[in-house]
Amino acid sequence: VEDKFGLSWQLILGEDNIKQKIIPSFLFVDKAYGKAEEAMKFYVSVFKNAKVESIYKYPDNEKAVMYGDFTLEEKLFAAMDGAGEHGFKFNEAISFVVNCDNQEEIDYYWNKLTSDGGAESMCGWLRDKFRVSWQIVPSIIPALLSDEEKAQKVMQAVLQMKKINIAELEKAY
């Protein structure tokens, strides 16, 4: 199902005991076809509280994932490989926010997610090697933006950064 904004939704009828109603789902298509399993294993290796829950392969293609799911920090995600031309690839229209309690966490997630061909962007944004967009954000941001006058200085600092530096934000505050 596609909504009026062009966002695709997959509706699944399941058991009543489902863990969460909305499950972010990655569809690996075109040049990314066949990378769903690799991506699931990569994300599970990056996040500390994570595991692959299930992987079901296509009977006629053991390299492609018909459906797989995995958890990251107790949140369920799904991944699939889709054959054929789909005319899209991952982009910044959808991103995942990782809230970090300190600079060590920011550095950890930034370095892991940009490894092996990922790309840095501005303001705490990055793309991993599968072109999935992430925002690596310090959990202190709401507090630093709560004072309207100081918020402008903090945002000016953020706009100059790729990876967020908490000490620099606190200095700007």
Task: Please name every model-derived segment.
Residues 9-11, 55-89, 134-138:
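Conserved short beta-strand elements that form part of the metal-binding/catalytic scaffold
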Residues 41, 67, 110:
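Short glycine-/small-residue-rich flexible loop motifs, especially phosphate/cofactor-binding loops
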Residues 2-12, 18, 73:
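Active-site-adjacent scaffolding segments
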Residues 10-58, 93-95, 140-173:
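N-terminal beta-strand motif that seeds the catalytic metal site of vicinal oxygen chelate
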Residues 18-20, 62-64, 90-92, 118:
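Residue-level preference for beta-strand/loop junctions
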